[in-house]
């Protein structure tokens, strides 16, 4: 039996739970929240939907329901408000994360932890410290969504199917994230060359506009509807799918990166091979000097916030 425990039944938690249930990634999904009535209501609603899909058990309960869970997905935390940086949330959500993981560990036997609560890079590092598990068994959602936005934007500009675009956002899931233009390509053809073929100026303004689109996307959504949900929910689903199907897929998840690219003891996103045991390998391919410098700057930002805890 594959059991997934979802901690937090807000927009993100339920978007993930719905996507995971529809994809039938597990036959037992447990919803846990400080608001037990809300969790029960969400489980009842989602269970009704599953009657039209297939035999997926949806239920709610306390932390004791984490027993036997293969994967624990943590989405609970203080809500990001309009205009508020993800890193502004650090102290409040670090405390919440510690409490949640301490409770989970009383019942769960060495699950994989998937972190989504913001600031996700800082809290992924906190989770690794609290749980004491192997580094690859605590995975932050990181820039999986940012990379998807990046690929989608590039695909739209170039007029190609997004599935042929290979491009990564690395570093912090937030304002200091870095676009790896030096590695970006369309089925092996560098984005710079694709732009030239289409008469598009591949200059600093072009690159800054594209990265700005990615960086500001969440703020634009929050400003209009108050929160994000579907994008990050599906990103979490993609990570869990890669684990449960042992895909060895490459995703830009947040993980401890000490020693990679000369970085210190922080967690941030780099392309990682994801399989049944979590993160199997961190891929640190050669990147441009300016990208290396920007990645180091992103790591310093996160290091400062970790030091402030």
UniProtKB/Swiss-Prot annotation:
SUPFAM superfamilies: LDH C-terminal domain-like (SSF56327), NAD(P)-binding Rossmann-fold domains (SSF51735). Its EC number is 1.1.1.27. Pathway: Fermentation; pyruvate fermentation to lactate; (S)-lactate from pyruvate: step 1/1. CDD domains: LDH_2. Gene3D superfamilies: Lactate dehydrogenase/glycoside hydrolase, family 4, C-terminal (3.90.110.10), NAD(P)-binding Rossmann-like Domain (3.40.50.720). Substrate binds at residues 80, 86, 118-121, 146-149, 228. The keyword Zinc does not apply. Pfam families: Ldh_1_C (PF02866), Ldh_1_N (PF00056). It comes from the Bacteria. The keyword Oxidoreductase applies. InterPro entries: L-lactate/malate_DH, L-lactate_DH, L-lactate_DH_AS, Lactate/malate_DH_C, Lactate/malate_DH_N, Lactate_DH/Glyco_Ohase_4_C, NAD(P)-bd_dom_sf. GO terms for biological process: glycolytic process; lactate metabolic process. It is an enzyme of class 1 (oxidoreductase). Allosterically activated by fructose 1,6-bisphosphate (FBP). NCBIfam families: L-LDH-NAD, PRK00066.1. Belongs to the LDH/MDH superfamily. LDH family. Catalyzes the conversion of lactate to pyruvate. Homotetramer. This is L-lactate dehydrogenase. It comes from Nitratidesulfovibrio vulgaris (strain ATCC 29579 / DSM 644 / CCUG 34227 / NCIMB 8303 / VKM B-1760 / Hildenborough). The lineage of its organism: Bacteria, Pseudomonadati, Thermodesulfobacteriota, Desulfovibrionia, Desulfovibrionales.
């Amino acid at each position: 039996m594959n059991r997934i425990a979802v901690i937090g039944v807000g927009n993100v938690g339920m978007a993930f739970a719905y996507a995971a249930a529809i994809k039938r990634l597990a036959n037992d999904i447990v919803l846990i929240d400080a608001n037990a009535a809300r969790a029960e209501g969400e489980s009842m609603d989602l269970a009704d939907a599953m009657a039209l899909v297939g035999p997926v058990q949806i239920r709610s309960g306390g932390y004791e329901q984490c027993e036997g869970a293969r994967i624990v997905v943590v989405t609970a935390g203080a809500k990001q408000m309009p205009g508020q940086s993800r890193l502004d949330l650090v102290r409040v959500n670090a405390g919440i994360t510690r409490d949640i993981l301490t409770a989970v560990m009383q019942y769960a036997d060495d699950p994989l932890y998937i972190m989504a609560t913001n600031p996700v890079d800082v809290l992924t590092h906190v989770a690794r410290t609290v749980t004491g598990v192997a580094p690859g068994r605590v995975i932050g959602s990181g820039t999986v969504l940012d990379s998807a936005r990046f690929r989608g934007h590039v695909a739209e500009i170039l007029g190609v199917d997004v599935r042929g675009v290979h491009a990564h956002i690395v570093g912090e899931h937030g304002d200091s994230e870095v676009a790896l233009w030096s590695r970006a390509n369309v089925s092996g053809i560098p984005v710079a060359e694709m732009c030239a073929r289409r008469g598009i100026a591949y200059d600093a303004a072009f690159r800054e506009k594209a990265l700005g689109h990615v960086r500001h996307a969440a703020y634009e959504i929050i400003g209009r509807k108050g929160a994000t949900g579907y994008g990050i929910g599906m990103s979490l689903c993609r990570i869990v799918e890669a684990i449960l199907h042992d895909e060895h897929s490459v995703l830009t998840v947040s993980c401890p990166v000490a020693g990679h690219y000369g970085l210190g003891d922080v967690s941030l996103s780099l392309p990682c091979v994801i399989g049944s045991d979590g993160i199997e390998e961190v891929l640190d391919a050669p990147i441009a000097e300016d990208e290396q410098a920007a990645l180091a700057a992103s790591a310093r930002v996160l290091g400062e916030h970790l030091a402030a805890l």
